[in-house]
Amino acid sequence: MVKSVLAGLLAAVILIFGSIIGADLALRSTMQVDLIGTAAHAISLTQPVNKDEIVTNPFDESYEMKDVQDEINNSVANMITYSEENGYWVNFTPSSAGMKSMISLSDKQVGALASTVIKQEAAGQVQIRDLYMDIEIYQVEFEKNEEGNAIVNSVIGINTTSFKSIIPDAFPLANIKNIIPDILYISSTNEVIKGEESFEYNVEHVDFTINNLSKEQTESFFYTLDTLMGVGSAEYINVQIGTTLMHALVGNGANKGLAYSLKEYGAKDFNFVQHGSDIYFEVQR
């Protein structure tokens, strides 16, 4: 009796293992998808993340926003207000005669401002395809400055609830769905390239990692999910995050942002400018 039960269990294990291997081989040959590797990456995502190793340039939003308020309001009166009930609020159509001076913000101040604007204008979310995912910004850092362009790194926490809701409850993705954490730590690095016209910018992919995965592992993980579900590649998601950040800082006709909203108040353009060892985001007049 015991032998027959053990034999049955062994047969079941062999069947499941064989199914995974079979599916992996089929997907490798038809779609170049590494299902076993993706499952291993998903398991790695469950490991503890040392946030201090990822967030190397943290900011205190309340502390930094006080300085942001002073800097911006000294140029454009009452553009940023504060109340106990609503916190900081950016008025993109202030009752002001115009800009009195250039606005200059450090990377930490940019992080605080971007966080405030994204909460205010985008419900604290980033759009990935048809999904809207809650985010929290932990870091913004300017890594390089060339001819007004910059390499901009942001570290965010992203809530995966809406993403996991669209993963099928069927083999082979069901097991991956069940072990993806509710919060992923994303390090997003893009190059912001100024356009030929004032206030124009393009965001180009540089580097993108999640939790403890390397760049290559992150790309492989999202390649599988994109191939099977159409969620977007690592490069696409990275650019979406970088673009959301730049919409808050600069903006355009469709997206409210600091620099573009001040065009009618005397703003000429935005720029990334280096002073000593520090790089600043500036709204010029």
Which stretches of residues belong to each language-model region?
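Extracellular/lumenal and peripheral-membrane lipid-interaction modules
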Residues: 1-285
